[in-house]
Structures are given as structure tokens and as C-alpha cells.
Amino acid sequence: MPIQVLPPQLANQIAAGEVVERPASVVKELVENSLDAGATRIDIDIERGGAKLIRIRDNGAGIKKDELALALARHATSKIASLDDLEAIISLGFRGEALASISSVSRLTLTSRTADQQEAWQAYAEGRDMEVTIKPAAHPVGTTLEVLDLFYNTPARRKFMRTEKTEFTHIDEVVRRIALARFDVTINLSHNGKMMRQYRAVQGNAPRERRLGSICGPAFLEHALAIEWQHGDLALRGWVAEPKGTTAALAEIQYCYVNGRMMRDRLINHAIRQACEDKLGIDQQPAYVLYLEIDPHQVDVNVHPAKHEVRFHQSRLVHDFIYQGVVSVLQQQAANPLSLNEPAEDAPRFQPENRVAAGKNQFADPAPRERVSARENDAPRYSSGGASAGSNAGRSAASNGGWPHATPGYQKQQGALYKQLLETPAVTPPPAAPSVTSAREVMPSAPALDGHSHSFGRVLTLVSENVALLERDGKLMLLALSVAERYLKQAQLLPHDEAPCAQPLLIPVRLKISGDERDIMTRAQPQLARLGIEIVLDGHHVTIRAVPLPLRQQNLQILIPELIGYLAQQPNADDAAIAGWLARHLVIAQPWSVAQAIATLAELERLCPQMVKTPPGGLLQPIDLQPAMNALTHE
């Protein structure tokens, strides 16, 4: 067969195979055209699930008479005119294929009138060459598109259509998504002459929760946490459901928008899932309605024919930005009291009322005095190797979906850790223990283990969510896992033989501070640098550029102001005291597994060998079995 140019109708039908998947696809394309035309009211009429009729009427700008024929032609659009326009597209449509494709697989009529025209005009295309016919019509300012008998001339496509109910369900879902994208537009949806949905426009700054509740349901609205997050050209707003209240039905609500365009993006979903993974069940998914605003030059929407996907030029930056925004609001909501065996500090927190993070961040407000934010834990709770497995290994294990919720039980990783626990080589403790803080001074010391001991012992099981049962030399002991984790965090923060490894922040955190706070930070800057916290003072602002690994995933907009308050109350605090304070804020109360307990103990023994010989108070509690044995022998 020789190479030849395809007839216009056949070419349009091929394009329709990519754009027009089902009636819902037609509704999406036509409603997006109405929104691009500036419509504030859109009426959608559906008959027989869209197979018989799809009618979209809007009050937008309309189309001039001499442009109607072009509107039905391929690759004709008013949205872009050059490559520069394509690379910075802000309209929903831009391909110029939708109307031509739809008209090739249906009987489409386009009726429109602009404000400066006295009469309306109607256009339709027919025949092999898709010739456009234009005739006068009666119509108000705006546009009406009628799509009759969808797929009437492509039987193969028509037989793949589902039942009327199923097709309308897909249309309803598309309309729901569009209604969530444009709160300022009234949208009405009817099916077979019956009004099914009425979404009234939200005027100005009026609350949007009413429409949100009508679309997502009262259950989502009850657990929804508002997000307002901004950095430079990136802005994130919307709602995410509190993980504890997320059910299987609620998890079906996953709507994300990029510059107002509804999107299915794996990067965005992964960032949100990662932010919620510690608080969700193993089979749970987060529920959210989120809007991402980004510089149009930094995102490519010309990826998918139906414009369902985008490609970010700086995907890692976008991922971390969304992750930090979601983590921030979850931590703000899930603030828990200190889960330690020692009382919290009595000194009141030093918090000015005018602290605002850069970008009008709403989550820089101080937490209540008796509570601190529950923060993501970067400790090496999960390990795929021996005792030297660091927090990076823990994080990668946590991200695979199974480890965060592992149930107690013997595994290969546990066996390797058991072996390493019992074969830890002798280490000569340093003359000054860097992990000793004032907390140890006020707590009675636990009984010292044997001088030749270099291991806390073997983890047998968990007797509660955060208490492990240990065995060594035939003796049993209870271990407070939260206390062990706190000392481990403190040891990771303190400088040792080499300078602490400061991790540069992808998005530096900039906070506004008062004159007194500037003096405090100036005085503490050398200490913070030794702990791996790099700050830059500039007038009445402080910028955090790098933090040590344990602080990498923390909400610094909350943590740093609280740290300033602590330094104001404790001006003579040394490195160990500051590290101890930070460690208390890194510990989060949550159930442990045996594998987590083994990994934490192994790392603690490696970093703090002196604790094995002289455990601090509150860490270990020996169990005396002799009375029970005497009772059994009736002695």
C-alpha cells in the first residue's frame, strides 16, 4: 500500500481514540473549554449516560462567527501561538484537537455568541472531509455544545461502552473533580431530565467547606486538616484527612490539581503517602484534596493526550515540598505529650506572637505548652544489616510499605542482629561520656552490668508497646525503648571524633525573629554549628541551611522557634543539654516491633558503649525471679 495522506475524518477518528475514551472524556474536554472561556456558570445535560446526548451550556466569552469553522478544525486553538506559550501554558486546553476529534465520532453542533454580536451562529461538521456548515441561531452570550449519538459511526468503540449507570458514574466523577478545581463557578449536572448535582459558586473569600463536604462527604470534612504551604514559586493548599480517621471508603478521595488542572501524578501521591506512612495502616491510603501552584515554566503538561499527567522539571524539589507541607500539618494536629520517664521542663516556653515563616506559612505557630509536636522519626528503627545500619537504611526499609507495621516474630534480619549483639567487640569507653545529660544526674542509676559485658542482652519479646524483655547470663531485665531511643538520638546529635554531618536542606527555612531572639541565636550559633545546625542571621530573619540527619525530616518551622525559647530559658546549656532537649522532641510514642528494638539497641551499644556498663536510670529494670521460684518450690 503506498503512503498517502489520511482523510480528515479518519485522522480525527484516530485522534479521538486517544482523547475520547468514553462519554466522561467528552464532558471533561468540553467543560474545560468553557472554563478557559471564562464561564461562571456551566449547565451539563446528559441523556442515557452520554450515549444519546451530552449538552454543555456556558456563559463564557463565546466564539466569533468567522472563527467557528476554525473551532472545529484540527490543530486550531486560541490558547497558544508559539513554543514559548506551550512551555508556560496556563489554560486547560491547548492542543486544538478536542472538538475536531469529538465531531468525527458523533453528531456535534456548536452554537455561540459573543457580547459584541447581535445574533448567534451555529456550526457543525459532516462528511468525509469534515466540511463545516454555519447558520444563524438564537442563543444568549456564551456557547452551547451538543454531542449526539456518541460513537454512532465507530461500532467497535460503541460496544465497549458500559451500562448507562456506569457511564454516568464516570461523568459524575469528572464533574466532581472539576467542581473541586473551580469553586468560583456554578456547575449543574442533570441526567435524563433530572437534576443530579448543583454546585453553587463560592463568592470571594467565603468558606469552601460547604462544596467540599457536598462532594467529598461529611466524613472527609470531619477529619480534614487544612494546608497552606508556600516557598518561592511553589504553593500548596487544600485538605488532607487525618490518618487516624481514614477509612477504606475515605481513601478513595484522592484529588490533586497542578495549576488548576486535575491530575493523576505518582510523584505527588508518593510524597503524600510517604508523609502519612507512619500513621496509616499497611493497606491504607491517604485521603486528600490538594492544589499545587507552580511556575508554568517548571512543569510540562504536554505529556499525555488527555492531559492527565505532567512532568516536573525539578521533581525532587516538588516531592520534598509536598512532603514537608503534609508532614507539617499532620505534626501540628497530632501533637503528643512527651513519652519519657522523666518530667518535662518546668520553664515556660519563650514564644513571641509575631513569628511567621517565609511564604505566609500557617504552621509556624507555637504548640501548646504541655504538648510538643509528634515528629517523624529518623532513627534506624528498621535495619537490613547489623548494628551499624544507619538511618538511611531505616528510611529505605520504612518506605517499602511492610516494615513500618511488621509484627513481632523471628526474621533473618533479627537473627543477624542477635548475633551481632552477642558478639560486640570490646570497646574502651572514652573518659567523658558525651551522651550523659542532666537528666541522668537527677535519675537513679540502674544496677551496673558485669564489667566484661558489652551488650545489653538478647531481646526476647515485647511485654508492652514500648517495653522489651531482655535476657543476659540467665537474668531478665525490662528495657524502656522510648528512653533508649532518646539516648540514641542524643548520641547521634552530639559531635564525636569528627564534625557532625550537616545535611543541606533542599528548601532552606527562613523565619522572622525579634532582636532578643537574634541575640540568642548569635550567642548559640557556635554550639549549633557543632551539632550540625547551620544558620545564617540576616537582620530580623534567621535561615536554617543545614541540619544533622536526625532532624532532616522534622518540621523546622515549629522546632527552631521552640529551640530558641529553650535557649532563652537555659542560656548556659552545653552541647549535651541542647542535644538532650532535641532528642526529647525527636521521640514519638508508637508501638514497637522486636526488629525495631534489636536495631535500636545495636546502634545504641555502638555509639554509647559506656551505657552498657553503667546504664542510666529509667532505661533498665532487673526482674527478680527468686520469689516466684520460691513460691513454686513452696520454700
UniProtKB/Swiss-Prot annotation:
GO biological process, one term: mismatch repair
Basic and acidic residues biased stretches: 367-379
PROSITE patterns hit by this protein: DNA_MISMATCH_REPAIR_1 (PS00058)
Region (Disordered): 359-410
GO cellular component terms attached to this protein's record: mismatch repair complex
Protein's gene: mutL
Keywords: DNA damage, DNA repair
Keyword NADP: no
Lineage: Bacteria, Pseudomonadati, Pseudomonadota, Gammaproteobacteria, Enterobacterales
A matching Pfam family: DNA_mis_repair
SMART domains registered for this protein in UniProt: DNA_mis_repair, MutL_C
Family as reported in the entry's similarity comment: Belongs to the DNA mismatch repair MutL/HexB family.
Function: This protein is involved in the repair of mismatches in DNA. It is required for dam-dependent methyl-directed DNA mismatch repair. May act as a 'molecular matchmaker', a protein that promotes the formation of a stable complex between two or more DNA-binding proteins in an ATP-dependent manner without itself being part of a final effector complex.
InterPro entries documented for this protein: DNA_mismatch_repair_CS, DNA_mismatch_repair_MutL, DNA_mismatch_S5_2-like, HATPase_C_sf, MutL/Mlh/PMS, MutL/Mlh/Pms-like, MutL_C, MutL_C_dimsub
UniProt keyword annotation of Oxidoreductase present: no
Species of origin: Cronobacter sakazakii (strain ATCC BAA-894) (Enterobacter sakazakii)
The protein, known as: DNA mismatch repair protein MutL
Composition skew (Low complexity), residue ranges: 383-402
Gene Ontology MF annotations: ATP binding; ATP hydrolysis activity; ATP-dependent DNA damage sensor activity; mismatched DNA binding
